[in-house]
Each structure stands twice: as C-alpha cells, then as structure tokens.
C-alpha cells in the first residue's frame, strides 16, 4: 500500500476536527505534519517533534506555509507538552508507551501509536481517553522504522512474548495505576498495562 494512502486511513480513524491540537512524534521532514496542520486548520495547532536536528531544520522550512505548525527538535518519547493534546500521532515503532503521552491526552483525546518488534513489525493501536478510562482499538498492521528513545531490549522481549501469545486485536483497554495487572494483561510497561478486558467508558 502507498504510504500516503496508509497514513490517510490512519488519520481518518483519528477523526480530527478543525481547531484541535495535535502532537506529532517523529515528524521527519514535516510531510505528514503539514497534512495534520491542513486538517486542523488555522485555528488548530500541530507540534511537530523530531529528534534529528537536521530533519527538524528541514521540517521548519517545509512547514513555513502552515503557521499553525511548529517544530521542536526534541526526543518525542520524553517530551512534555505542558497543555492537553486532542490527538497524539507517533510516527515510529515503539516497545514502550510513554507515560508523558498518556498524561498529555485531553479528555476525549486520542493516541495513535505503533507497537513493533525487533523486525519492525507490529500494529498501530488507537487509544482514547474517556474520563479515567482508556479504551483501545486495533487500527492497522504495520512495518515501520523504530523510534529512538521508545525502545529497550527488555521491553522488546516482553512485546515479542505477548505477540506470540495473543493477537493485537485482543487488546481492549489500557489501564494505569493504582489498577494492577491481572489475568487480562496483554502487556505491561512502566505506569501502564494493556488489557483484553473492555474499559469502563465509551468506545474509542
């Protein structure tokens, strides 16, 4: 599938609205950040995060025509937005879900994130925030470049084990402390775990 068609299908699932605030992790040279900026319009905002300084400079130049988009040369995994985001789009494969992303989600916010193994294969999950609940929906299978800062060997091994036990489509919710992992746990990370049980809240 053409990558532009693939990303268009993912952006459709986010159901972005005019005026919304989006954080784009792994912006590269800014192509998809520009599309996000066009979708949210002049009243919206896109914060494009890129860890590579050279790519961040190119993205700034390429996004000059979209004043609602700004580029930050930073590690998107550790970045704290400081204000809630309506949508967070992660453009590289991770083995870990950053607690900072979850903390940055506004009420009814959405997080689109690819969990991938050592071979860069995995799936995009669409995580929503509904009060204290985080319903999760499978969005797409993927093969995508790894996210610098969003992976470690131990988490990669845990993810590989989870993928061998059950399909991504079994995941129904994300849970956070003080709720402890139980027998519905698909994968656990620091400050979060994925469950095959439905969330107490609306569907994502």
Language-model-detected regions and their locations in the chain:
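A glycine-rich, Thr/Ser-enriched phosphate-binding loop motif common to dinucleotide/cofactor-binding enzymes
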Residues: 1-12
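Acidic, low-complexity intrinsically disordered regions
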Residues: 3, 62, 97, 182, ...
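Solvent-exposed, flexible loop/coil residues
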Residues: 4-5, 83, 148-149
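Intrinsically disordered, low-complexity regions enriched in small/polar residues
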Residues: 8-9, 34, 68, 81, ...
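Conserved nucleotide-cofactor-binding alpha/beta core module
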Residues: 11, 15-112, 117-121
